[in-house]
Amino acid sequence: MLLTIPTAVTPPWTTMLGFSLLPAIVMIAGAALAVWRAPGPKLRSAILHFAAGVIFSVVAVELLPDIVEHHAPYEVALGFGLGVATMLGLRYFTQRLEKKEESGEAGNAPAPSAGAGALPPTSSLPWGLLVAIGIDILIDGLLLGIGFAAGAKEGTLLAIALTIELLSLGLATAIELRQDGHGKGRAVAIVAGTSLMLLVGAGIGTTVLRGATGNLLEIVLSFGLAALLFLVTEKLLTEAHEETETPLLTLAFFVGFLLFLMLGMVA
């Protein structure tokens, strides 16, 4: 007989909306900061390490114990497998889209200007990059909905963790848009537009999963577990390690983990 799990206590819609707005606003603020004074690679690597530690802490301290406690191995295997397959499939799709766009831009590159002080022309929108970022943020929103499906505490901590991640994403996206020749205001506006995908994802997640119980909830939490682990190991830490590793950068990961471990204990 399949195991049933008690219903998680989910917070009101207004609370979930507020916690969904927080990461989106911080992402826009990160973009504004980047166009005003772009942070150095060391600082961005430190933010990525810290965000990875925070999310890993939420996974290990909040989600994983809830999943293990209910002893539903088949549901866990199904949800976890679906999570890994989904993240791998999305990465394959977005990488192909970005490569296709890069090939098109290389073939249509304009001849260099003869003027010594000529500014780079404003590029068309990098749709491959924006679609990849939009999907990434949409998944973050879904994960936030999954977090609140597990409970108010789990959702709140995950919202704070994703806020740190999206700060880094806002910084990186704005910097890349500026390097492509987009103006400061346009770069921030593009980031603001993509940040709306977080609200869409969170809305879908909370609508579909609100009141989820039993085996469905266990599958969903296991899916979120796999997706968050993928986010930490294959995105945040991979990007963080593009910068030469130092003891202080490594320490940022453990500071983030310890901080949210303690926060989870006292909250």
Where are the model-predicted features located?
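Intrinsically disordered, metal-sensing/regulatory segments
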Residues: 1-267
